Amino acid sequence: MTVTETRPETTGTGGVEHVDVLVVGAGVAGIGAGHHLRENFPDRSFAILDTHPDRGGTWWTHRYPGARSDSDLFTYGYRHKPWRGPSIASSEEILNYLDEVIEEDDLKGSIRYQHRVVSTSWSSDDARWTVEIRREDTDETVRMTCGFLWMCQGYYKHDEPYTPEFPGRERFTGPVLHPQSWPADLDWTGKKVVVIGSGATAATVVPAMAETAEHVTMLQRTPTFMIAAPKTHELAIQLRALDIPEEWTYEILRRTYIEQFNELTRLSAEEPDAARQYLLDEMRPHLPEDFDIEKHFNPAYRPWQQRIALLPDGDMFASIKEGKASVVTDTIETFTETGIRLASGEELEADIIVTATGFNLSCFGDVDFTVDGEPVDFSQRVTWRGIMIDGVPNMAFVFGYFRHSWTLRADLISDLVSRLLTHMDEKGARSVTPTAGPDVELRPWSDPENFNPGYVMRSQDRMFKQGDRAPWTHMHEFAEERHTLPAADLDDGSLKYS
């Protein structure tokens, strides 16, 4: 029996639903997987499960002011589906785009919302996964089986954002909140706001709140590189004025953004001092003449060792220039009744404190995995090309790029998984298992010399690992994987079929 075949099963008095492919997650990766399954395998059964009440994943959960993309949408959009909006888009615009994909690919009936995957167990005898699911809407436990499991749930612990232990936090009399759990009724009009953090979320929240707040202070322990980018690309305007197919416009813009991005990442790796100077020079015209750019926007790490925060039309810089927002680089001594006292002795008054201090990573949604009764410890497993796990049969996962747009890798992975499923059918194989030899050395999923933001470094001990050689490595670079993944040899001995 190949992974495309089904057979009825029962448990107790009820039937257990079986699908050929079970996709976990109805965000960008999961909906993209659904498109590829629908397009490449019209006769194959599949379902998409998601914990939340609606589609979108991160874009559904992020409700904080100004929530938007931190990548351009011409590369964040799917390869098959032209993006027709601005280069940088709001969460609402992205959700509308996903709705179009769901409708065009007839995915609505395949998505099961409020289905939280709790555990999954593989049986080699049956060549299938048994998946335990908790219905969030009814609190009942249900079971499904599948021939192939495709984990597209992302890597954020949405219900457990990262917030450090701040001394004296209980003393502050106003609200303290994390962007991940933003209250819908919060009113910051005319209020003094302190946003703790310096990453993409802080760079989004600060200008959005500054529109109506009395003043917003971004308090950071260390700086982040930031860059202003046009919300609407001039080339997009020019191309859309021409009488050419939208698909051409999309592909031209997509390639343009990819090559521009590749050039900056190349410069950052090969000539980091030149890349640093370029970024600082790009920021200066947007900021007040007396602004201390070296102190506030010149981090110690080299460019792209952590993500560069993208500012649509330089919105946060504009808030600073207009006096609506400011940046303070210091460490917190303690919260007080009326704000925050810093190590320098300065006190920041606040009515509201926002802790934009990052996220915790989740390894496969913290789902319990077993293979033939043995628990899987992912922290002791290497990945096959950053897509499958050593010793875990018939399971693929999507982990996008740290620097490039997430969806670029999601599309490449969908291509490879589709090719693998077809290859299994051609071989008459029921299962495929990545199998690394005992001499493959375990290395961190992300090399700190390459990419080392706090949310990644905090999670290295519980994340899956890279090996010391191909195909047990993860390149993290689209410029390389756009060639290596389509050319991956599925019969090089690293995958065992049965």
List the predicted regions and their residue ranges.
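Beta1-alpha1 glycine-rich phosphate/pyrophosphate-binding loop at the start
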Residues: 16-23, 28-111, 220-221, 286-291
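C-terminal active-site-capping segments
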Residues: 411, 415-498
